[in-house]
C-alpha cells in the first residue's frame, strides 16, 4: 500500500517517543502513520443480520475482513470504488451499513462489554452519528438515547444518519456538554463521551491533521475534557457505566484526564479493565486497564478508550441558569391515539410500547418512553420521529417514520426491481409491468422499506425526499 507524506512536528515526535510503551517500535509507528487508512463498514443490525448482509453482497466481489472488537464490523476492499463510491451504493442509501473507521467502533464495544442492557444512554458528542447508530443497534432500538452535539452545523448531519439507519429511540440536543451534570443529574444508565481532542490519531486519514498542533493546545484541550468528563460523571446514575474515548495519542488528553477524575472522586470511580474486550486487546492495554491504541498495533487509527463505573452518588452541581421554555407537544391517548395507530398499521407502520404518541398542531410524533422524564429539564432540538401530518382525508406519513417502522412483509409492500429501484432513488415515478392493487404502497427493495407512495392508475408516484435524490450509478454490478 502506497505511503503519503504526513506532517509531524518535532515536539510531537518527542512526545510520542515518551508515551509509547517499550514493547512497540517507533519506526513502525511512523510507517503506520504514513500508510493510507483501511476502509471499514459496520452492518446495521437493526435492518439486516450479519449473515444476510454477507449473503446479499456476496456476488459483488467485495473483500470483507472481520474487525475483532465488533461482530458487525468489517474492513472492506472493492475494485469498483472509482466507478461507484461506497456511500452511493443502494445498500448504504437504505441504511444497511454505516461507513465507520474501525477504531471508532471500540467505544461502543466497551460500553456494552459486560452484556449490560442500559435503558437510557447519552452520547455526549454525537455527530456525525456513527456511535449513536451503533448504540441504537446494540439496544435494539429500545430504551432511549440522548444524542447531543455542540456544533450546530453538525446536528443536521447527525439527524440525517439517524434517519437513514431507521432509528426511532433518539432525542437530539444542541448544548455544550458541560451543562448535563447540572441539568440531568444521575439520569443515565450509560454515557459515552467521545471527547473533542487534538486528533493525533487521524493522520492516516488527514496527513495535515497536526499542522496546528502544539503541546500548549493539548493542555488547553485536556482542561475542557476534564470539565466534560466531570459533567458526564455527574449525569451518570450510581452503578452506571461511562466510556471516555478520544482519537488522540498523548497521555495528557487520555490517561491523565481519567486519573484526574479518580483523584477528584476517589472511591466513587472504578476503572473497569478492557483487556478481555476482544482477542489481543492486551496488546493495547495500559496499567490502568485502558486501551491506548497506537496505529501500528491493529493497523487502524490511533485511539484511546477507558471504561468507568460510578460507585456512589455525588453532591449535586449548581442548578443550570437557562430556561427550557414551554413544551409544545401534548400526549395523545384514548380514541385519538387508537385512530392514529390503526391508520398507521393499515399502511404497514408498526411500533411497540417503547414509543408513545404525541401531537403538535397537525403533526403527530413518536417519542421514546424512556426520554419522557427528561421533558422540562432540557430543550430538545428534535425528539423521537415525526410520524405524520394530519389533514382532512387522513394522514400524510413521513419518510423517516417509514424507514424506521415499516414492515417489509406487509400486504401493501411492493418490491422493486433493480431498474425500478434506481429510478426511485433518482426521484422518478415508477411504471411497473404489474401495478400493485392497493392505492397506498409500501415501496421496498432488497426487502427494505424505501418509502410510502400512492398508486395513481398504473403509476407509483415517487415520494422520496428531494434532498435525498441521487444521480449516477447506484448499484454494484449493474450498468
Swiss-Prot record:
Catalytic site residues?
247
Is Cell wall biogenesis/degradation tagged as a keyword? no
Q: Which residues bind S-adenosyl-L-methionine?
A: 125-131, 149, 176, 194
Fetch the Gene3D superfamilies from UniProt. Answer: 3.10.450.720, Vaccinia Virus protein VP39
What reaction does this enzyme carry out catalytically?
cytidine(1407) in 16S rRNA + S-adenosyl-L-methionine = 5-methylcytidine(1407) in 16S rRNA + S-adenosyl-L-homocysteine + H(+)
Q: Which PANTHER family match?
A: 28S RRNA (CYTOSINE(4447)-C(5))-METHYLTRANSFERASE-RELATED, NOP2 YEAST -RELATED NOL1/NOP2/FMU SUN DOMAIN-CONTAINING
Which UniProt key words apply to this protein?
Cytoplasm, Methyltransferase, RNA-binding, rRNA processing, S-adenosyl-L-methionine, Transferase
What InterPro entries is this protein classified in? Answer: Methyltr_RsmF_N, MeTrfase_RsmB-F_NOP2_cat, MeTrfase_RsmB-F_NOP2_dom, Nol1_Nop2_Fmu_2, Nop2p, RCMT, rRNA_ssu_MeTfrase_F, RsmB/NOL1/NOP2-like_CS
Protein's job: Specifically methylates the cytosine at position 1407 (m5C1407) of 16S rRNA.
Q: Which branch of life, at top level?
A: Bacteria
What name is this protein filed under?
Ribosomal RNA small subunit methyltransferase F
Name the predominant localization: cytoplasm
Entry's Gene Ontology cellular component terms: cytoplasm
By which gene is this protein encoded? rsmF
Which GO biological process annotations does it have? Answer: rRNA base methylation
Q: Where, subcellularly, is it found?
A: Cytoplasm
Task: Tell me its family.
Answer: Belongs to the class I-like SAM-binding methyltransferase superfamily. RsmB/NOP family.
Q: Which GO terms describe its molecular function?
A: RNA binding; rRNA (cytosine-C5-)-methyltransferase activity
EC number(s) per entry: 2.1.1.178
Source species:
Salmonella typhi
Amino acid at each position: 500500500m502506497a505511503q503519503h507524506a504526513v506532517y509531524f512536528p518535532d515536539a510531537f515526535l518527542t512526545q510520542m517517543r515518551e508515551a509509547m510503551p517499550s514493547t512497540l517500535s517507533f519506526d513502525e509507528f511512523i510507517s503506520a502513520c504514513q500508510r493510507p487508512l483501511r476502509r471499514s463498514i459496520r452492518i446495521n443490525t437493526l435492518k439486516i443480520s450479519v449473515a444476510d448482509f454477507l449473503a446479499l453482497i456476496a456476488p459483488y466481489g467485495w473483500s470483507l475482513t472481520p474487525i475483532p472488537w465488533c461482530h458487525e464490523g468489517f474492513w472492506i476492499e472493492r475494485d469498483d470504488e472509482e466507478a461507484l463510491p461506497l456511500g452511493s451504493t443502494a445498500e448504504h442509501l437504505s441504511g444497511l451499513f454505516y461507513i465507520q473507521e474501525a477504531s471508532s467502533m471500540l467505544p461502543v464495544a466497551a460500553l456494552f462489554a459486560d452484556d449490560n442492557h442500559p435503558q437510557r444512554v447519552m452520547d455526549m458528542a454525537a455527530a456525525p452519528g456513527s456511535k449513536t447508530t451503533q448504540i441504537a443497534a446494540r439496544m435494539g432500538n429500545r430504551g432511549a438515547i440522548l444524542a447531543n452535539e455542540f456544533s450546530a452545523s453538525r446536528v443536521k448531519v447527525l439527524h440525517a444518519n439517524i434517519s437513514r439507519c431507521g432509528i426511532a429511540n433518539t432525542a437530539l440536543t444542541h448544548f455544550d456538554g458541560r451543562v448535563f451534570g447540572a441539568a440531568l443529574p444521575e439520569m443515565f444508565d450509560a454515557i459515552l463521551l467521545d471527547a473533542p481532542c487534538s486528533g493525533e490519531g487521524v493522520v492516516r486519514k488527514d496527513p495535515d491533521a497536526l499542522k496546528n498542533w502544539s503541546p500548549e493546545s493539548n493542555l488547553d484541550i485536556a482542561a475542557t475534557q476534564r470539565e466534560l468528563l466531570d459533567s458526564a460523571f455527574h449525569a451518570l446514575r450510581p452503578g452506571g457505566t461511562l466510556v471516555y474515548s478520544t482519537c488522540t495519542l498523548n497521555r495528557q488528553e487520555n490517561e491523565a484526564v481519567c486519573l484526574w477524575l479518580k483523584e477528584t472522586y476517589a472511591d466513587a470511580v472504578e476503572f473497569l479493565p478492557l483487556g478481555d474486550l476482544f482477542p489481543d486487546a492486551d496488546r493495547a492495554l495500559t496499567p490502568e486497564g485502558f486501551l491506548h491504541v497506537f496505529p501500528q498495533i491493529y493497523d487502524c487509527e490511533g485511539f484511546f478508550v477507558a471504561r468507568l463505573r460510578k460507585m456512589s452518588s455525588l453532591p449535586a452541581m449548581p442548578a443550570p441558569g437557562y430556561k427550557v421554555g414551554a413544551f409544545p407537544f401534548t400526549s395523545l391517548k384514548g380514541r385519538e391515539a387508537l385512530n392514529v395507530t390503526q391508520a398507521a398499521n393499515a399502511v404497514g407502520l408498526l411500533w411497540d410500547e417503547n414509543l408513545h404518541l404525541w401531537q403538535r398542531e397537525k403533526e403527530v410524533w413518536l417519542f421514546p418512553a424512556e426520554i419522557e422524564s427528561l421533558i422540562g429539564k432540557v430543550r430538545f432540538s428534535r425528539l423521537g420521529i415525526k410520524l405524520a401530518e394530519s389533514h382532512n382525508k387522513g394522514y400524510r406519513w413521513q419518510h423517516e417514520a417509514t424507514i424506521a417502522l415499516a414492515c417489509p412483509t406487509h400486504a401493501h409492500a411492493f418490491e422493486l426491481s433493480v431498474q425500478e429501484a434506481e429510478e426511485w432513488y433518482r426521484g422518478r415515478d415508477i411504471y411497473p409491468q404489474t401495478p400493485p392493487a392497493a392505492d397506498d404502497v409500501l415501496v421496498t427493495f432488497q426487502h427494505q422499506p424505501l418509502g410510502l407512495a400512492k398508486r395513481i392508475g398504473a403509476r407509483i408516484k415517487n415520494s422520496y425526499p428531494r434532498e435525498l435524490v441521487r444521480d449516477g450509478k447506484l448499484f454494484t454490478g449493474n450498468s
